[in-house]
Amino acid sequence: MNATQDMHPELGREVPVGRIDRELRQLWAEDEARTNASLINFAIYSEAPGSLERNSRVVEELTREHACRAMLIYIAREHPEPTIRAWITAHCHLRAGQKSVCCEQIAFALTGQMKGRLRNTVFAHLNSDLPLTFWWQGELSPIFSERLYSLVDRFIIDCASWGDPAAGFASVLAALADSPKLVVQDLEWTRTFQFRVSVAAMFDDPVAQAAIPSIQTVTIRHHPAHRLAALQILAWLATQSKWSEGRGLQLDDARRPGAVENFHFESRGGREVSARLVSDPSSPALGTLEIVAGDVSVEIVREAGASHLCRLL
């Protein structure tokens, strides 16, 4: 059975790979009222069935604000036969009642062994004048190699989806050492952003700032699927406060609902700092961050489904 035979029509017009550029020119010639806009190459890679359709909807929303040439890539590596199919479409949005501003999308479905097909065939359709942002969805596979990341300017990952985070980060660190221009963005780290900003803002208060050397306990409540976000913000707190580690922050512990993990640090003044990570299925990615230092207690809370944080001092 062809692993790519059932594709949603929203992917657009199926075209022979060798005719992609010609078909794109024809697409624009069919409607002169549309304007082609592109500021970056934006590629989304996945090995999950159904990802092309899901990611096409992602690109449709993204192009409302960000002009790009989008490339969707799905690969079924375990399929016995090497095949490749391609579709083209344009996501168009009206701007202030003027012409439709449209962004090109090329979707590729590949099966079987790659043997250079990703770089030589798929990447041949990048706009060579524009930087490449590459969003890798899911666990890193052997396809993540120098032949890929040497072409990438910004590499987006989400370590929350990794079954082996230690191996994944080792691969990313090796790529960074090999390709200094590469910029890596982890969506799990991005999920901690508002908490980090809130902590920094609260410790601008003179009372809270004076209490930093006296911090005794840190408690972080998180969703089981986002344990790494909790570890990342704990590591950030330890780094900012210059605590020394009593026990390494293990990446490979099981994700267990209701599980409590305990960590111990030593402050710059020699005090013991105890940290707890509490796994709660009812929590958003990060639900609560509580810091206690003597009589001072700082708490940052996000309720499930809320778009804002509450800060208590």
Each model region followed by its residue ranges:
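Structural alpha-beta junctions
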Residues: 60-72, 126-133, 150-156, 177-181, ...
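Conserved, well-structured core segments that form the ligand-binding/active-site neighborhood
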Residues: 107, 114-209
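A generic structural motif
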Residues: 69-79, 134-138, 159-162, 186, ...
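An N-terminal, globular interaction/scaffold subdomain
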Residues: 1-137, 142
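A broad structural signal for short, well-ordered beta-strand segments within beta-sheet-rich domains
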Residues: 102-103, 152-153, 215, 260, ...
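C-terminal structured domains
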Residues: 5-9, 19-34, 38, 56-60, ...
